[in-house]
Amino acid sequence: MAAVRPARPSSGHPETVLRRRVRMGGEVSAIRLRFLGCGDAFGSGGRMHTCFHVSAPKGQFLIDCGASALIAMRRFGVEPNAIDAILVTHLHGDHFGGIPFVILDAQFVSKRTRPLLIAGPSGIKRAVSGAMEMMFPGSSRVQQRFAIDIVELVPERSQAFKAGVVIAYEVEHPAGEVRLALRTECDGKVIAYSGDTGWTPALVSAAREADLFIAEAYFFNKRLRDHLDFETLRTHLGELSPRRWIVTHMSADMLERLPALGCDYAEDGKVVML
């Protein structure tokens, strides 16, 4: 597997960089996001693990790649070889555990030849290699027929990839050294994702005025340090000011309340056009 390298910094405050690109973009093409999986770690509601597929004019990428990601790609007709990058928020299995399956499929089934970028928090190379060895001993040492570039995202620095730009923000969740929220910009459209986290001011920077903010709402009103609940999220929406927001990563407690809440929520297979 390729050597890990840090993300390269860019000039200017990260939020300013993205806003400037949005304003200068003029007419933009449609961005399509499909929820391949929107469930929690425990399969609440029979939902797949977290994985969002984004199709943009310049490329396709995944935001998180939970353990069931490859199954979901097959189910919803997403071609694995078309994926240019996988962006990872944190190193829990329901958010990155599908990467070994994607790599093995690329090597032995889909016969991938195009390079693949994997970008995530510090320690991601070690985590991916360790997961591969745990599930398929020896697999991390196989010479791939395609290049894998593993990048550590540095909080509050922008990282370019084929489809656009991503900026990571450190959030609160017990998952290794660094846990991230992600703000991506593709062709003038901003998609922000909270990852798993309790409330933190970093979410304001990550989600402010995003075209789409995908936010964890694990519980309805039970407050935890490391998971966001719906009531807390709703309280802070004025600070975030997203153009659209969708809740995801819901426990059974939250799923049972959805019909009465009147909010926009993720479902496996749901498509959002931007």
Where are these regions (language model features)?
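Compositionally biased, low-complexity segments
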Residues: 6-7, 25
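Binuclear metal-dependent hydrolase catalytic cores
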Residues: 13-192, 205, 259-274
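Short beta->alpha connector loops
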Residues: 67-68, 172-175, 197-200, 251-253
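Glycine- and other small-residue-rich loops at beta-strand/loop junctions that grip anionic moieties
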Residues: 121, 195, 248
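Cap/insert and terminal regions of metallo-dependent hydrolase folds
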Residues: 198-274
